[in-house]
C-alpha cells in the first residue's frame, strides 16, 4: 500500500511520497531520518501548492487549526484519487477526520503516534525536500505567519471582548465620581454669584448648561433659556435672578466657572455615549445575563470575576454573594449570619421585593443567572441566530421570576402560556372575532315511521291494586289542616302582642323598648306580676352582689373541706399512734 505524507508549511501544502511502503513500521526510522540525506532517501516530493500571499496563508492555517478542509487542500488531495490502495499520514487527528469525510476519496488515514518521528525529521530538513525554498525565506515566512495567527486569535478571543466590558464599567464608575465632584464644584463656585439657582435646579447637566448660556445673572433678560428649561422653571429662574442676593464676580472668574461647566457638559455627554456602548456590548456578549439582572449589574459581575468564562465557572451560591467577600469572611470569623447578597442586590427584581422576600429572590435570581451565564459563555450559535434567540432563556426566566415575585408579594399573577416579547413584556393577544352561527334548515327534516310495538315479557307478576282514598280528598284535608294551624298561630301572636302592650303600659315604656329590656333582663316582676324597669347601674350592683355571694359560698365550702381533711388526718395519726 502506497504511503503519502501531508505536510502543512508556512509556504504552502506539500504532499510527500514514501519510498518504502512500510516506512512507519521500521524500528530504525529515527536514526535514519536524523540527517538531510537520510530524509531524502526515505521520502520524495509528490506535489507542492504554494500560498499566493500572507493573507491566504493566514486563512488556510486558521482553517486547519479549526479542523476544516479548504478548497486548496481538497484540490491537492485530488491527485491521489486515481491511485489504488493508498494510505495518507496526517499530523492532526481532527484534520484527518475531516479529510475522511470528503466524498469520492478512498484513502486509509493514519493520524497516530507512529507519524511523530517522520514529521519531526521532515520539518527539520524541509528546505532540502522542496526545491527553490531557502532556509532564510522559510524562517521569515514562519515568523510572519505565527504573528498573524496570534493576532487573529486575539482579535476573536472572548476574553479580549470581556476586557472591553471590564474597562467600560470601570470608566463609567470613575466618570460618575468625577462628574459628581465637578458638578458640586460648579454649584459652590457659581453659588456665590447666584445662590438661588441651586435650589431651583437639581439637574447637574441643566445647571451647567444654564451657566454657559446666561453667564452673569444680570443677563437674564436677554438670555433665552427655553432650550434648556421648561416654561415654569424658566420663569422662576429669571425671577430669582432679578432679585438675587449673590455677590458680584469678575469676567475672569466667570470664564473659569464656565470652563468647568463645559467639562461637566462634555463628561455627561460622553457618559451617555459610554452607557450606550456598554449596553450594546452586554447584549451582544451576555444577552441572558443582561435580560435577568441588567447591563450595569451584569457588567460589574463580569468585572469582579475577571471574565465571562471565569464567571460561568462559579456556582449560583458564589454568584449570589459576589462582591460581599469582606462581610462573608467577617461573618465566618465572628460566627454570625452570612450575607444574603452582594452585587446582585442592585438588580431590579430584588429591588421590587420587600424586606422578607429579598433573600429568597436573590437566591432564585442567582440560580437562573448562573444558567444564563453558562449559555452566554459556552453556547455556539449559528450565524443566522438573532438576538431574540440568544436571549430567549433569560427573557423566559425573568418572566417566571416576576410571576414568582408577584405570588410571594400577594400581587395578581401574570397569565401563563403567553408569548413573551424581546423586551420581556407579554405580547398582546389577538382580537377574538365571533362569527355568526349557522342557521337551522327546517326543510331538511324527515318524519320517522311509527315503529311496531313489541310485546314485552312480564318480569314480575302483577298484583291487583286495593282501593284507596282519592288524592283530591287527601289534598283538601291537608289544606284545611294547614289553614287551621295558620289561623291559630295568628291568634296566638295577636294575644301575645296585646299582653306585651299591657305590660309595657304598666312599666311606662313603649312596646319596642319593653321588648329590648325584656331580652336584656332589665325588667323585674313583683309578687302581683306587675313589671318595672331596672336601670343599668342597679343591674351592675346586683351582679356584683351575686358574685360576692358566690365567692363567699365558695370560701365556706373550701373551709368545710379543709376542716374535714384535717379531721381525717388527725384520725389517721391517732390510729398510727395506737
From Swiss-Prot:
Which keywords accompany this UniProt record? Nucleus, Ribonucleoprotein, Ribosome biogenesis, rRNA processing
Instruction: Indicate, by first and last residue, each region the UniProt record lists as having compositional bias (Basic and acidic residues).
Output: 495-505, 547-561
Q: For this UniProt entry, what is the primary localization, expressed as one broad class?
A: nucleus
Q: Where is the composition biased (Acidic residues)?
A: 462-485
GO molecular function terms attached to this record: snoRNA binding; snRNA binding
Q: Where does the record place it?
A: Nucleus, Nucleolus
Biased segments, Basic residues type: 569-578
Pfam families xrefs: Nop (PF01798), NOP5NT (PF08156)
Q: Which family does it belong to?
A: Belongs to the NOP5/NOP56 family.
Task: Give the protein's recorded name.
Answer: Nucleolar protein 58
* Species whose genome carries this gene: Aspergillus oryzae (strain ATCC 42149 / RIB 40) (Yellow koji mold)
